[in-house]
Each structure stands twice: as structure tokens, then as C-alpha cells.
Amino acid sequence: MDDLRFRRVHVAGAGGLLGTAVADELEAAGHELLHATAPVDAVVHCPAPEPPGRLTHRRLAAHRRGEEARARALAQDALVSNARLVHVGTAFAWGDHGSSWIDEGTPQRPAPLGAGDADVARHLLALRKERGLDVVFVALGLVYGPGGLFERALLDPRSRVVGWGGNYLSCVQVDDAARAVAAALQRGTAGTTYLAVDDEPMTQRAVADAAADAAGRPRPGTASLGLAGARVGFPLARSLAASQRVRNARAKAELGWAPRFPTVRDGVWTALPR
């Protein structure tokens, strides 16, 4: 076990799927988890899940405003306490790059679910330049695990592949995501972004089929972007239809992290209803 550089940690968003996993991972590693009002060595900002139900542009905008306000407040807290801030974002900030590979240096053209995160990252980097904020960024692939998007999709017989399904998705199992966040807290370089995804981007069709096969359910059909957007909301539909082949080389090399579930096929069972 590493000597803990940042022992006292506040995890913002610890009640969600990802935040719970991050809190569990840090506690198991020996960190002391504290409330926001206590003196801390580090703050981890886990994003709140998108609101349930149909995700309209208006609902997403309201959610994004809340997340941006929380990120700004946590950054101020970190500056006052001279604490490290780990901002957990999403690979959707890079958007659709077709069949080309994406790494941290790839230009961002955010998908709808990543637009707010790109704005927050710019603000936090400005605070680093102007006031010395010790901030590290972890951008996660599509996170799956118990109680998450995959489980909800499996329980909904109306779930469909958006479009023809040939776009790439880069995913990460929730416990692997939590381990990446913990590694970034301990070993990440300030001002640096780490993309944390599994080892094999799969097409949306392959991901959907792997989930259905693991659950013993029929493989889903397809729906046009228009039909999918009308049912689940266009921001979500457009994001799921974006093609993202994301590399994890920097996280492996600099953080010493590697996914225990290298593909969705290996880990999808963890998202099945129990």
C-alpha cells in the first residue's frame, strides 16, 4: 500500500453509484472520510447522476448548472484548505471522433452529456493558473455497475440500440473507475487529465448484445435517433450514438492503474439485477 499523501478526504457525491464506490475504495485504502465542514487534505468531486426519466435539454441544462456550481464551490473550499481537488468527469467531453482513437491530447468536441464537464475543466484550469489550485482530472468512460444505466436498460423491455449501433463505446466498470480515482488522488500530477476506460472499446451493438446475453434476455432491436430521442431524451440518445475509441495508456503508465475488467464482456455481470 502506498504511503497516503492525502489521508483526510471529503467525497462529494458519495451517495451515487460512482461516489459510493469511490468512498468504499478510499476507506479500504486507509483514508479517513470526512464531511465537507471538516479540515481535509483532499476533495474528490464525483458527478451526480443525471436525473431519472426522459432527459430533455432543459433538464440536462438545470443538472449541468447545479454540477458547475458545486464544482466551483468545491474548488474554493480546496483553495482555502490548501487541499487537492480530484475532479471526476466524463470521456463524453471529447465527443464523436468516429473510428479514430481518442487520448488526452485529442481536441474536444463534446457530446451533450460532456458539454458541462468541458466548461468546468476550463474554469478549474484557470484557477490552477491564477491561484495555484492543486487539481487533477479523471475522465471516465461510460460507467456501469449495479443500479446504473446498464441495469436500468436491462430491466426495460423497450431498450433499443440507438441508430445502427456501429459507433464505439468506451466503458469502465464502477469499481475499476473508483480505483482510477483513488490512484489519481495519490499519484496524479496536478493539472493533468487521465482518461480511465477499459482496454477494449466495443461497438454499441456489441455492448448491448453482451449485456443481453449475460442477463439471458433477447438481444435488443434498433431505434432511429429520432425515436430514441423521443423516448429517452435527445441529449442521452445523441451521446450514446457518439463514437468514442478511447485509450487508457496515460492512466496505466502514470497512475499504475489497470482495469480488472478489461472489457464489458468480462464485467457486465456486475451490473445485473441481484
Regions found by a protein language model. Give the residues of each.
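Conserved beta-loop-beta element that borders a ligand/cofactor-binding pocket
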Residues: 90, 121-146
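Conserved C-terminal active-site "lid" loop/helix of NAD(P)H-dependent oxidoreductases
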Residues: 205-209, 229-258
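Amphipathic terminal alpha-helices
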Residues: 262-274
